[in-house]
Amino acid sequence: MPGLKTHIIGKFKDKASIGKARLVHSFGSTAVKYIHLALLKSTTRTPNKPPNSDYVSAVISYSNSRYAPAAFSAALWRLRVTKNAIVATKSLIVIHKLIKSSRDKFEGLGHGRNNLKLNEFSDKSSNLTLELSQWIRWYGQYLDRLSWVPKVLGSFPNLLVNPKDKVEEKDRVSSYQTGYIIRQTDSLVSFFEHICTRPEIPPMFQNKIVDEIRELVIEDYFKIVRLVMVRLQVLFERLIKPGVKPIGDLGLNDFSLLLVRLVECKESLSGLFWRCRRLADDFWCLVEMLKAETEKKNNKQMIELAGLVQTTVKDDEEMIELVGSVQPEWVTFDDSDF
């Protein structure tokens, strides 16, 4: 009975919000009015249902037009004024799809991290909303990171759509300094590390809202895998190919630590492999090859360093022996010399 009452109240609030939006935007731009109405209809309080795809498509249709800022503002407004976990989760899904559909124009969620400010979000009205609240806190940080990927890379090419993009991306990355490639890769690995922190709570409800979040994250994951893979391939060539500008000692150390962090993500990310198994296998095979190569290079440096230390110690010992073998001579002066 309490569940039915909550459902009825939710329906009433949804209709009231839509009626208010019609009134508020009745004298404004028709496009802005449609954006707000489509957004409200896609982020209803109906539990266990993801945002209505038709209404989401209507919002996204403005993402590459001059009304893109209005679409983002409407979604962010909807997110920030609600205390309902179902509405907040659906709003985040809409924001995610807006980011994905307008990567070339999207300026990010702000000038820093944690712009969505959802770290304290909590809806304790039911077990379902408690479960969704954990996802909301994680998902907000995830979208903050996703919005910064184009800033880190300069763009967000989709290497799956056009094979030529992969060649162009590799040519572009090959022109970068090694340190810059490592910094880019470091940011992308941080993205993987955040995916590893996703909620692992047992699903109390077979919730299609959470299923859609997982689906969107998996799509992003494999796009990022392709971007990381291009950078690892360029770094691998610089490690093993003669005539190619080598990775310096400092860069090698940073790269080794980065690979260790990447390997530590593998187990947690393994649950996402099923979508593109071959790509995942190729990616982790490359990571293992690079890790082995960097370890070999580091071991070689350690051997050379040990040899240098041994030579230095031997030289010092010979110098001590030489000094010890020199007999002091006493010099006497005649008084007539003064």
Curated annotation (Swiss-Prot):
Gene Ontology molecular function: phospholipid binding
SUPFAM superfamilies per UniProt: ENTH/VHS domain
GO terms of biological process kind: clathrin coat assembly; clathrin-dependent endocytosis
Pfam families assigned to the protein according to its UniProt record, in alphabetical order: ANTH
One annotated Gene Ontology cellular component of this protein: Golgi apparatus
InterPro entries tied to this protein: ANTH_dom, ANTH_N_plant, AP180-like, ENTH, ENTH_VHS
Subcellular location per the Swiss-Prot or TrEMBL entry: Membrane, Clathrin-coated pit; Golgi apparatus; Cytoplasmic vesicle, Clathrin-coated vesicle
Domain ENTH: 27-157
Keywords: Coated pit, Cytoplasmic vesicle, Endocytosis, Golgi apparatus, Membrane
Protein name, as recorded: Putative clathrin assembly protein At5g10410
Organism: Arabidopsis thaliana
